């Protein structure tokens, strides 16, 4: 096979060389009948052309025939070759050339093997060609296009040492799946199911009597039987399956919810283990990782959240558990062994569900557990901190951040004053870094509420909070900058005048940049801060310090901004400063005009100096080195 390939390549080289020596005599090449490579002098182009064409056609037939024969016997000998492949190391190297007159042999694979000693011999189990006819076997190539332009193409089932590596052109012409698309432009994969339920094998239920139809002494036993019925898990991915039994389970859940809500004196100590078991079997299940996150793909907001098909049963199970926790007869001291850390960890993992309805009921459930089980409070806060830290620094994929922050806001509201050092560390290490994520818009209202609660509890934290917000202030994300400006206004509602002095200079430097923004909504939101009376009063008390910082941006915006509405608002803010202290304002305007004049003079001098340098450079003759 190697000999036939070398003949075939040499014939191609002969054809190429003959094309490069038209209308002249030169040293020519031909292949004799015995296959030897012969050089002759002064052979005419026409004779050599016909002979090389004939040899090329003949060698093409030999080559294709050999390939077809090997394709037939390749699978039959695959078992024998498996034992040989353990000792054989085959490396294929393809060298490509971009010139038309290059040697075609550079495209051939280089075979390195420890067992094939003579490279001119055929590989083991490779059949030798018997005839030159290949026309009857051309149809055996269903997936390969054979043409005169692709003599070296081989079928997909050829040995690895005969398959050439793809060239850059082949990669370019390949399918779209081989194109290296940026990650931010790739479509976000959607998961089909938010969770996986362990469907019960026996799913046939019998309707039990209602609580009103039995004696009072038998209601507790009936309650337990209904709970056992509700332990059966149905397949809601098939809407047409077990319709009657699904309805029986839903009715049983509704009856138990009404029974717990309307009756007092229920022995919760004996029933609560059964309720926890039913809750665990129905609610706790694996949640798929969040794939449709909003960290990099803003267009993912158009995607509808996945709603749990089993929600008709899930909702009632949640409500039953919540009703039990809210029952006046419930005693948390007797349920500590049931609602423990492991139970809470499984409950916390469910906050990653994509269904907002379930996250809402999870939030209520966690509220009740935090209020009832005092021994778990520290562990609950620590576990929530871990979720936030993982979201910030690792994967930024978790659906329930907003709900957890809402729970945390009510927890912070109940903190005792003065705040513990643990809570201050949580503010600086967790809450403030939550501003840096790309998906902050999903939970920003809840985050702002937590920040405001901390400042309200301890005003001395104002400087640390505002410094952290300025640290993570967005530079190119206008939508995120609007959120930060809204948060600044909310913080001013609880800001102490004594604390404002410590942070006003860096804060107003950032406000000046926002006022100068070409995004009209950002500029408008920054200017509208002066519509807040408390904000304006704090500014008036420190106008001497703040006006020099903010005036250049206000002046440029009022005169140069592309939006006429923004220009009008900027003029109104300037008028507010005039009303605060007209004398200081007029003096500042004069100083600003003088500074502008000096700046223009400096620019004129600089321009003149550059003109002089250009004139001197034009007078100098170019040196030999520059030539």
UniProtKB/Swiss-Prot annotation:
Q: Which residues form the signal peptide?
A: none
Major site of localization recorded for this protein: cytoplasm
Similarity comment: family membership: Belongs to the phosphatase 2A regulatory subunit B family.
> Which GO molecular function annotations are given, in alphabetical order?
protein phosphatase activator activity
Q: Which organism is it from?
A: Schizosaccharomyces pombe (strain 972 / ATCC 24843) (Fission yeast)
Q: Could you tell me what this protein is called?
A: Serine/threonine-protein phosphatase 2A 56 kDa regulatory subunit delta 2 isoform
Q: Which GO terms describe its biological process?
A: deactivation of mitotic spindle assembly checkpoint; meiotic sister chromatid cohesion; negative regulation of septation initiation signaling; signal transduction
Cytoplasm keyword on record: yes
* Assembly mode: PP2A consists of a common heterodimeric core enzyme, composed of a 36 kDa catalytic subunit (subunit C) and a 65 kDa constant regulatory subunit (PR65 or subunit A), that associates with a variety of regulatory subunits. Proteins that associate with the core dimer include three families of regulatory subunits B (the R2/B/PR55/B55, R3/B''/PR72/PR130/PR59 and R5/B'/B56 families), the 48 kDa variable regulatory subunit, viral proteins, and cell signaling molecules.
Keyword Cytoplasm on entry: yes
């Amino acid at each position: 096979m190697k000999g036939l390939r070398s003949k075939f390549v040499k014939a191609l080289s002969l054809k190429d060389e003959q094309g490069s020596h038209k209308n002249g005599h030169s040293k020519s090449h031909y292949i004799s009948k015995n296959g030897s490579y012969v050089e002759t002098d002064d052979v005419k182009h026409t004779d050599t052309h016909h002979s090389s064409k004939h040899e090329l056609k003949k060698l093409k037939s030999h080559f294709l025939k050999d390939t077809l024969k090997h394709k037939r016997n390749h699978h039959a000998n695959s078992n024998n070759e498996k034992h040989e492949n353990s000792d054989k190391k085959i490396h294929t190297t393809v060298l490509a050339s971009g010139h038309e007159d290059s040697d075609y042999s550079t495209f051939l694979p280089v075979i390195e093997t420890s067992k094939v000693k003579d490279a001119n011999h055929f590989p083991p189990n490779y059949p030798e060609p018997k005839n030159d006819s290949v026309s009857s076997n051309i149809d055996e190539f269903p997936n390969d296009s054979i043409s005169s332009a692709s003599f070296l193409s081989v079928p997909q089932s050829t040995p690895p040492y005969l398959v050439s590596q793809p060239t850059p052109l082949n990669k370019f012409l390949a399918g779209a799946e081989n194109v290296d698309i940026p990650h931010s432009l790739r479509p976000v994969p959607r998961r089909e199911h938010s969770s996986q339920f362990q469907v019960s094998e026996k799913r046939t239920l019998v309707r039990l009597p209602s609580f009103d139809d039995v004696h009072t002494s038998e209601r507790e036993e009936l309650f337990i039987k209904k709970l056992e019925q509700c332990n059966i898990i149905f397949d809601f991915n098939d809407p047409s399956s077990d319709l009657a039994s699904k309805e029986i389970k839903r009715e049983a859940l509704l009856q138990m919810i009404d029974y717990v809500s309307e009756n007092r004196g229920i022995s919760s100590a004996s029933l609560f283990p059964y309720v926890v078991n039913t809750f665990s079997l129905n609610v706790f299940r694996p949640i798929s990782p969040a794939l449709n996150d909003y960290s990099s793909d803003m267009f993912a907001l158009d995607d509808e959240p996945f709603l749990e098909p089993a929600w008709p049963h899930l909702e009632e199970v949640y409500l039953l558990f919540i009703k039990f926790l809210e029952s006046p007869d419930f005693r948390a001291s007797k349920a500590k062994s049931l609602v423990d850390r492991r139970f809470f960890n499984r409950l916390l993992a469910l906050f990653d569900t994509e269904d907002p309805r379930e996250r809402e009921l999870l939030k209520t459930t966690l509220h009740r557990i935090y209020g009832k089980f005092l021994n778990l409070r520290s562990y609950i806060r620590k576990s929530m901190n871990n979720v936030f830290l993982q979201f910030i620094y690792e994967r930024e994929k978790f659906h329930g951040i907003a709900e957890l922050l809402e729970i945390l806001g009510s927890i912070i509201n109940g903190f005792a004053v003065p705040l513990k050092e643990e809570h201050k560390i949580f503010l600086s290490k967790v809450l403030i870094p939550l501003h840096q994520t790309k998906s902050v818009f999903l939970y920003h209202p809840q985050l702002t509420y937590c920040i405001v609660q901390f400042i309200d509890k301890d005003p001395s934290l104002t400087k640390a909070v505002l410094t952290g917000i300025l640290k993570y202030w967005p530079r190119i994300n206008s939508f995120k900058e609007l959120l930060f400006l809204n948060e600044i206004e909310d913080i001013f509602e609880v800001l102490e005048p004594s604390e404002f002095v410590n942070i006003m200079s860096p804060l107003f430097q950032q406000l000046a940049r926002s006022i100068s923004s070409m995004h009209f909504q950002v500029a408008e939101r920054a200017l509208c801060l002066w519509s807040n009376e408390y904000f304006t009063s704090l500014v008036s008390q420190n106008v001497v310090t703040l006006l020099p910082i903010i005036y250049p941006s206000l002046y440029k915006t009022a005169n140069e901004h592309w939006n006429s509405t923004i220009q009008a608002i900027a003029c109104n803010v300037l008028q507010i400063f005039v009303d605060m202290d007209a004398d200081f304002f007029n003096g500042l305007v004069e100083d600003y005009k003088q500074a502008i004049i000096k700046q223009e003079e400096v620019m004129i001098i600089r321009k003149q100096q550059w003109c002089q340098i250009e004139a001197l450079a034009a007078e100098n003759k170019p040196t030999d080195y520059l030539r």
